[in-house]
């Protein structure tokens, strides 16, 4: 899935730039793909049991791993050329927190920067896989309006059989 779904979508987004933020890297599978394509990568993971081993594994590389809440990261405004999130939006405990995340993405993106993501659709088999886990699906039908409310626009959306992919941009001016 990473090489057939995620990587082509990231490459279709174009140049991610020199300073990229990955939100919710988990064990770092997508981090490994991204770090080979960008100069500098900051990965923000809220779960210490995932952030700590990822930080240790990637020590001395072009990746900085932070254990933090991505909805209030404390990172510099207008810093990142791109922000990514892969299969993590549905793990946010509420739609309100998803919207806070979108606002934080807007805050930390440079003008003209891109927000690239993939997430699961609301399907029975995906819900069954989250029985003991958070599953607050994002409706791709209203994603554009939610991103626009956060200040992001120029949405490109691709809805597949079990997931959707998106690219949005922070306006240049």
Go through each PLM region and give its residues:
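Residue-level recognition of oxygen-bearing side chains
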Residues: 80, 97
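Short amphipathic alpha-helix with an adjacent loop that forms part of the alpha/beta core around
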Residues: 73-78
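A short glycine-rich, Lys/Arg-flanked "PGG" loop and its adjoining helix->strand segment in the class I
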Residues: 99-111
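Short catalytic micro-motifs in class I SAM-dependent methyltransferases
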Residues: 87-91
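Class I (Rossmann-like) S-adenosyl-L-methionine-dependent methyltransferase catalytic domain
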Residues: 1-62, 67-72, 95-96, 116-173
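A conserved beta-strand element that flanks and buttresses the S-adenosyl-L-methionine
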Residues: 84
């Amino acid at each position: 899935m990473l090489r057939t779904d995620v990587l082509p979508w990231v490459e279709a987004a174009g140049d991610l730039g020199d300073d990229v933020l990955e939100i919710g890297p988990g064990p770092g599978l997508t981090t490994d793909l991204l770090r080979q394509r960008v100069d500098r990568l900051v990965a923000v993971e809220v779960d210490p049991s995932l952030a700590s081993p990822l930080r240790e594994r990637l020590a001395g590389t072009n990746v900085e791993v932070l254990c933090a809440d991505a909805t209030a990261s404390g990172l510099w405004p207008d810093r990142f050329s791109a922000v990514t999130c892969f299969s993590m939006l549905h793990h946010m405990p509420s739609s309100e927190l998803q919207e806070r995340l979108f606002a934080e993405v807007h805050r930390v993106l440079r003008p003209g920067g891109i927000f690239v993501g993939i997430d699961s659709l609301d399907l029975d088999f995906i819900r069954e896989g989250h029985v003991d886990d958070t599953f607050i699906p994002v409706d791709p039908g209203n994603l554009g309006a939610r991103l626009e409310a956060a200040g992001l626009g120029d949405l490109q959306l691709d809805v597949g059989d079990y997931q959707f992919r998106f690219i949005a941009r922070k306006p240049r001016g």
